[in-house]
Amino acid sequence: MKKTIVFFITLLFCQFANAQNLVWRKMRVAHTLVENYETDKNNKKVRLGECFIVNSSNRELARGKYKNGLKDSIWNYFSANGDLVQVYDFTNKKLLYNIPDEGTIVKQRSEVDTAGLVKPKVVAPVKIGGLNYGFYLLYNERNLPQAAKDQKEDILMEYVFDVSATGKMEGFSINYISTFYNVEFKQSIKDLHQDAYEFIPATVNGKPVKSKLVYQVMLYISQARDRGTYNIPTHKY
């Protein structure tokens, strides 16, 4: 009995000591996203413990835990309206819950090669974190091409990701599509926030395969109050 009591006292002391060594830090991870996370007092680079990410409206889009700098256990992802849209288990690398985000401006399409197959069973690739969070990790309206902002009609903007059969991002481009303006800009995949790289691969008949996952967002150029500036609406009014 005494040994049991001593064990629990020691365990509680260790947990208290660990908590005392943790501090909260804050870092901007994208133009409109801020990450709040716990680290060791003496090593701010390694995340330990709780973490959550908020948008410019201070709405929480992601929440989970880190262990030794890696995502651990269950992470929850939310829409901009606060609805739970995805749950992912990083310990077991398993998608537990995933529903369409009805409130996001981001639409999705995917491309999977099924040439030569008869009635294949195709499961589209999935962005871990959801489309809305994944898009805003990379989007900054200040980086829109001047030629796009100078157009007189609305433009479809596509973020096209090449996803490997293991779920790795192998390529990334931004395409602008309209009647008179059609351009593809290849993007570097180096030094992005780590969440931007996280995908679940597509499958064909149960086998993981390469694919393309595409975010689609309309740029309502015709509604811009200051034509030619970076202030281009992504919502139709």
What are these regions (language model features)?
Residues 24-237:
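Charge-biased low-complexity segments
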